[in-house]
């Protein structure tokens, strides 16, 4: 109940409504007290009433250049004028008093006094008083003062918590953490051993700067952490602060930019001022590309708010006196869009690429995230790491979290191998849709489609191994085949990429050979194949006709002018022809493989229709012997990790 009242009080509309009634009521009651039973008349009416002898008393008071006149009628008058708020019909009232204002051009005080005396009216003269002036002034100013007071109070509440007032828009929004509050250490960051080695110097400088400065060394003013999302860039920055034992100021790049001009630059100055007071300290700017994009290409023109903020950031990082002991660590996914002035030596002069972890790194990451999870004995994290190539730390954490959720839904007390297997499928392809009604014809189409991918992958197995195939719908896919690399690869050869292209074409080719139809199930296959083939031609120089030339590099930024065409129409045509040639070659290769292995292709498709999901051991048995393993034929069940381990050993 208390929270509801606070919400009502802080509602701006209710405040404005309250202030309106307050001011209106104040003015109404003030005017009502001063004018009850009285009417305002002009100078002509005043002279007429005095001449008619209907004025009993007359009081006038000089008020600057005008004369304020009031009086009492001998014979009260009746009036139907509204003197206040009327809710129904106006009432008839008796008017005994009157007021009037006489200008210097109307008459003089002596003439008015003589006229009133001649007609037997009692005249009273009041000297000009300053109190009346002050009362009128207060009546005019007090309501507006109250209005502005409440408006500023509301702006203070809406200006953000933490005691901010409406004048504090320019204060830094960074979250400050004292060294005692930072519990993250290098041991908590797994799978980034090389990256940690690059940051050791930063930690050592913050701990003992004299050891470097006496040799004339200059520690990097800024460290740029670049890498895909989820690789642990923020965690690395916290670990540096934790190991060095220094305060940590964290802020997002988007927090600098506001609709008010100059706010971003002011926040940058405020951030560095706070860091200087706490030096030595670390400033961490997450997603710095939000504020550090190249100047002159923004949507707001050449002198927009973002550019002013960037200019101030450049100035603060440029080695001004007093910045010693402050190291700026920034994280981004797109260093290619950052302003060159931000990346020059003296600012972000050290760049650390935080890449995807290898199999050992993935295993170490899994061990870190499995500390608070009860795992069964059949769970082998090394095997999970082998099955998740390309996964980053966030993906691996998500796998274990999904496994815990799956185990909870199944009312288990520990997480076993089947839970992790299901979690991997959910992360890769989405939740299964077992209740989705699929016609028998469509099931056959999907089975032969996935069997086409599988048979091509089995034949072309130089770099990748078929790990799993299923026709259980997940996400938007009717089925899928997973092929894992035999080992972590940083480089792909032209032949490896051609094999992948042929594997992607296997599904559509199988549809055409078996059913003589073309379905929409191959749309994602074509998308991946086209992207890969175009990259081979335009980025990797793998076209014999076009040669080792890169035609497409960094993509244009949002807000930048359209990039000038660096290739001719003829070259663009030749690029399209080369891409088409690669895809047709892959298609023909897939067709040749499926035609040569029609019986095996049919066996895999029929097994998929019966069991829905096949693992690597079952697929290998069908390919080599034409039969399913006997243990699996007896009963369909979720594979244990012991079975998966034996399959992985067989694949090797």
From Swiss-Prot:
Quote the CDD domains the UniProt record gives: RecA-like_FtsH
Question: Which GO-annotated molecular functions does the record name?
Answer: ATP binding; ATP hydrolysis activity; ATP-dependent peptidase activity; metalloendopeptidase activity; zinc ion binding
Q: Which Gene3D superfamilies match?
A: 1.10.8.60, P-loop containing nucleotide triphosphate hydrolases (3.40.50.300), Peptidase M41 (1.20.58.760)
Where ATP is bound, by residue? Answer: 227-234
Gene Ontology CC, one term: plasma membrane
Q: What HAMAP family does UniProt report for this protein, alphabetically?
A: FtsH
Its recorded name reads ATP-dependent zinc metalloprotease FtsH
State the organism named in the record.
Streptococcus pneumoniae serotype 4 (strain ATCC BAA-334 / TIGR4)
Query: Its encoding gene is what?
Result: ftsH
């Amino acid at each position: 109940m208390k929270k509801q009242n606070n919400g009502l009080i802080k509602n701006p509309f209710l405040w404005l409504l309250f202030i309106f009634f307050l001011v209106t009521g104040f003015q109404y009651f003030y005017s009502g007290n001063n004018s009850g039973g009285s009417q305002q008349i002009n100078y002509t009416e005043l002279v007429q009433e005095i001449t008619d002898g209907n004025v009993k008393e007359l009081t006038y008071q000089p008020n600057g250049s005008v004369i304020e006149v009031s009086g009492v009628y001998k014979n009260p008058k009746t009036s139907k004028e509204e003197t206040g708020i009327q809710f129904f019909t106006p009432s008839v009232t008796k008017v005994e008093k009157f007021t009037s204002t006489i200008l210097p051009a109307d008459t003089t005080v002596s003439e008015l006094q003589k006229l009133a005396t001649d007609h037997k009216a009692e005249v009273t003269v009041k000297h000009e008083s300053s109190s009346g002036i002050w009362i009128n002034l207060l009546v005019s100013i007090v309501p507006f003062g109250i209005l502005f007071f409440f408006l500023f109070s509301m702006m203070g509440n809406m200006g953000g918590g933490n005691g901010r007032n409406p004048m504090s828009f320019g204060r830094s929004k960074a979250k400050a953490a004292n060294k005692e509050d930072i519990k993250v250490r290098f041991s908590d960051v797994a799978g980034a051993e090389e990256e940690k080695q690059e940051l050791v110097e930063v930690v050592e400088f913050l701990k003992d700067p004299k050891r470097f400065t006496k040799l004339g060394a200059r520690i990097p003013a800024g460290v740029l952490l670049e890498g895909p999302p989820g690789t642990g860039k923020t965690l690395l920055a916290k670990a540096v602060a934790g190991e060095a034992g220094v305060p940590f100021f964290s802020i997002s790049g988007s927090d600098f930019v506001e609709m008010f001009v100059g706010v971003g630059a002011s926040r940058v100055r405020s951030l560095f001022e706070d860091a200087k007071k706490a030096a030595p300290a670390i400033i961490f700017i997450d997603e710095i590309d939000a504020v550090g994009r190249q100047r002159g290409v923004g949507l707001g023109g050449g002198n927009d708010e973002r550019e002013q903020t960037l200019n101030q950031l450049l100035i603060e990082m440029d080695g001004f006196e007093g910045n010693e002991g402050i190291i700026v660590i920034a994280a981004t996914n797109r260093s290619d869009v950052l302003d060159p002035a931000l990346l020059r030596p003296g600012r972000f002069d050290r760049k650390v690429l935080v890449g995807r972890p290898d199999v050992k790194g993935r295993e170490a990451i899994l061990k870190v995230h499995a500390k608070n999870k009860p795992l069964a004995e059949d769970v082998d994290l090394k095997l999970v790491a082998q099955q998740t190539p390309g996964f980053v730390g966030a993906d691996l954490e998500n796998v274990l979290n999904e496994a815990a959720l799956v185990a909870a839904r199944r009312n288990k007390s520990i997480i076993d191998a089947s839970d992790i297997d299901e979690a991997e499928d959910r992360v890769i392809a989405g939740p299964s849709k077992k209740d989705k009604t699929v016609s028998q014809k469509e099931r056959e189409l999907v089975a032969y489609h996935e069997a086409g991918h599988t048979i091509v992958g089995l034949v072309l197995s130089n770099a990748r191994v078929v790990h799993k195939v299923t026709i259980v719908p997940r996400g938007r896919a009717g089925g899928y085949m997973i092929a894992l690399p035999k080992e972590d690869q940083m480089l792909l050869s032209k032949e490896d990429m051609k094999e992948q292209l042929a594997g992607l074409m296997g599904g559509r080719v199988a549809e055409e050979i078996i059913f003589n139809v073309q379905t929409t199930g191959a749309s994602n296959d074509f998308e991946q194949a086209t992207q890969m083939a175009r990259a081979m031609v335009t980025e990797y120089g793998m076209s014999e006709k076009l040669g080792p030339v890169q035609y497409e590099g960094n993509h244009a930024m949002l807000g930048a002018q359209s990039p000038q065409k660096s290739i001719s129409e003829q070259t663009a045509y030749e690029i399209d022809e080369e891409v088409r040639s690669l895809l047709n070659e892959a298609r023909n290769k897939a067709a040749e493989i499926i035609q040569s292995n029609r019986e095996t292709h049919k066996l895999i498709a029929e097994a998929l229709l019966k069991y829905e999901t096949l693992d690597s051991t079952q697929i290998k048995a069908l390919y080599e012997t034409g039969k399913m393993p006997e243990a699996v034929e007896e009963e369909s069940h979720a594979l244990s990790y012991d079975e998966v381990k034996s399959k992985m050993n067989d694949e090797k």
